[in-house]
């Protein structure tokens, strides 16, 4: 009952109180690293991050801020993301920082994180089933560069725990350099060859390796191990410099750390060749004595999450077992002390209730997710709008929901809807065309093509067809193929129920523009050999092109039938046949 009252009060507040307009600022942001590096403001960078590092030892909130400013895992909004995406240009900025401030712990941490993230981009996220041998070798070379940078970072003052945390995870995924144990037990490894596997592969496939190395800035000029520091904080190494060793390094610097354990545990799961039993033993060990009861509960619940994150409720045959699983998830979502545990349970429950077509339970879970500030993916975002238009019309609820979910989200549909409604001055937003267009421009890229399609089409599903064409036109102005295609389909609708006047000539123009953009994108893709694996975004170029060429064929057929000029009619008929052929390729 108390939970029900809390939910009702929260929904009442969303309906009747207008929160301040937000601007998309990142939650854990410490500094604009690329911007400050371009301006060579190295002292300011060091001051900001040294202060954040010092504060990270004093409270969990400060520790969390520092951790998420530097860690990219399930965190697309950390401070280094644009620097890593810049590839060799970003690396060059980091190297300039190191040359200007050779004892800057954060200049070295930046390089460690650069190579960490680039290693993951070579591997790809998920199960890495499409990762090639050359990509794995490049990832290992990045990992080697990361370890060198991490040792330098840890050797500097103030003492750096984050570099060891990143290295712990990477050593589980990419292994450890062959020379590392030798170095840690006291040998001098300066001058030893690095990247030997990459050099060997390069002899057999130079074009492939050169193309892959160019993504990150890997270079055979760095193929010899430099003189490495021996930070005094490094513990004794017993023939294994892997995940556990680097966790020990981290805890030697920061004995009461929590967030590094929150990342460490998932990489001890069976999917990473570990076991739940090993995790339970670890949580009972003295390493975890400093944890609070709530923190220990959260780490234990990661085992539940590992068991259930990929489980679909309809895969469970027994109704009694289904009820038990749902009840446990509900309990976690209500009772878990740490927000991330509640988030995991709520994310699972909304998929569960969607699969069961239990709309009442789904809507209740979505509302609770809003209260808990869970970020909604594109699918559940639009589900929520559908329910809210039914239950909370003519209130401030939609405005508050749009603001909350467009903030620091990796999903494009919330940004599109936020931008459109602010541009148009609807659903509680004051009309601000400039700010609205800025939100739309942030996702005005072909990789979001499928998101624009859903955002436009779902206006009909919402019962708001009057917004279909205005948003499609804004998308067309940004050369979004899906928007152009949808406008073409409306103009090519002969049934008098289209949102635009029937005119196959206008429709043809939209279809041709969409096809031209998609063909250009396909040509670009084919002209770029040895691309990295795309872990998301729009990839259905061929299927969409087939459908568009079919629509172009239909337009030409209709235009030929109404064309009195024989020569023009013949040209339309030829275009009809050509596009029907392309539609079946």
Show the residue positions of the predicted features.
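Canonical positions in the second alpha-helix
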Residues: 97, 153, 249-250, 286, ...
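Short helix-capping/linker turns of helical repeat alpha-solenoids
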Residues: 103-104, 159, 256-257, 341, ...
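Compositionally biased, long intrinsically disordered regions
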Residues: 1-45
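TPR/TPR-like alpha-solenoid signature
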Residues: 109, 116, 165, 262, ...
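Short coil/linker segments at helix-helix boundaries
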Residues: 31, 35-101, 113-253, 261-292, ...
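Hydrophobic/aromatic packing residues within the alpha-helices of TPR/SEL1-like helical repeat arrays
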Residues: 94, 143, 150, 247, ...
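TPR alpha-solenoid repeat register
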Residues: 107, 162-163, 260, 296, ...
């Amino acid at each position: 009952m108390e939970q029900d009252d809390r939910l009702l009060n929260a929904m009442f507040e969303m309906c009747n109180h207008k929160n301040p307009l937000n601007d998309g600022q990142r939650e854990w942001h410490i500094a604009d690293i690329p911007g400050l590096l371009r301006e060579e403001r190295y002292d300011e960078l060091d001051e900001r991050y040294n202060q954040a590092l010092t504060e990270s030892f004093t409270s969990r909130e400060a520790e969390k801020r520092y951790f998420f400013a530097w860690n990219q895992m399930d965190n697309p909004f950390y401070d280094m993301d644009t620097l890593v995406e810049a590839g060799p240009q970003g690396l060059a900025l980091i190297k300039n920082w190191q040359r200007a401030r050779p004892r800057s712990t954060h200049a070295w941490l930046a390089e460690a994180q650069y190579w960490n993230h680039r290693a993951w981009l070579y591997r790809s996220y998920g199960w890495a089933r499409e990762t090639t041998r050359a990509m794995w070798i490049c990832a290992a070379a990045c990992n080697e560069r990361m370890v060198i940078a991490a040792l330098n970072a840890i050797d500097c003052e103030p003492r750096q725990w984050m570099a060891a945390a990143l290295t712990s995870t990477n050593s589980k995924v990419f292994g450890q350099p062959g020379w590392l144990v030798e170095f840690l037990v006291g040998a001098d490894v300066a001058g030893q060859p690095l990247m030997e596997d990459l050099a060997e592969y390069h002899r057999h496939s130079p074009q492939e390796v050169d193309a892959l190395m160019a993504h990150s800035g890997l270079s055979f000029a760095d193929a010899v191990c430099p003189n490495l520091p021996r930070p005094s904080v490094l513990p004794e190494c017993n023939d294994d410099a892997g995940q556990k060793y680097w966790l020990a390094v981290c805890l030697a610097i920061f004995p009461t750390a929590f967030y590094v354990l929150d990342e460490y545990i998932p990489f001890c799961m069976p999917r990473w060749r570990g076991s739940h039993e090993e995790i339970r033993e670890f949580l009972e060990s003295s390493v975890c004595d400093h944890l609070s009861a709530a923190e220990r509960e959260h780490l234990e619940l990661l085992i539940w999450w590992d068991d259930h994150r990929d489980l679909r409720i309809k895969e469970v045959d027994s109704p009694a077992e289904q009820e038990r699983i749902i009840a446990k998830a509900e309990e976690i979502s209500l009772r878990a002390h740490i927000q991330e545990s509640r988030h995991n349970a709520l994310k699972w429950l909304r998929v569960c209730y969607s699969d069961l077509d239990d709309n009442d339970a789904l809507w209740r879970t979505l509302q609770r997710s809003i209260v808990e500030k869970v970020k909604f993916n594109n699918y559940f975002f639009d589900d929520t709008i559908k329910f809210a238009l039914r239950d909370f019309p003519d209130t401030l609820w939609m405005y508050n929901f749009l603001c909350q979910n467009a903030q620091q989200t990796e999903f494009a549909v919330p940004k599109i809807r936020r931008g459109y409604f602010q541009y148009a001055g609807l659903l509680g937003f004051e009309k601000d065309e400039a700010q609205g267009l800025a939100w739309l421009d942030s996702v005005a890229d072909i990789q979001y093509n499928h998101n624009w399609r859903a955002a436009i089409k779902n206006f009909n599903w919402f019962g708001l067809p009057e917004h279909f064409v205005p948003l499609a036109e804004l998308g067309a102005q940004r050369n979004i193929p899906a928007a152009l295609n949808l406008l073409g389909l409306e103009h090519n609708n002969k049934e008098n129920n289209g949102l635009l006047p029937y005119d196959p000539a206008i429709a043809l123009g939209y279809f041709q523009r969409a096809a031209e953009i998609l063909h250009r994108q396909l040509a670009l893709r084919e002209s770029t050999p040895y691309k990295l694996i795309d872990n998301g975004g729009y990839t259905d170029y061929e299927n969409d092109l087939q459908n568009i060429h079919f629509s172009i064929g239909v337009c030409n057929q209709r235009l030929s039938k109404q064309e009195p000029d024989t020569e023009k009619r013949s040209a339309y008929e030829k275009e009809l046949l050509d596009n029907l052929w392309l539609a079946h390729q």
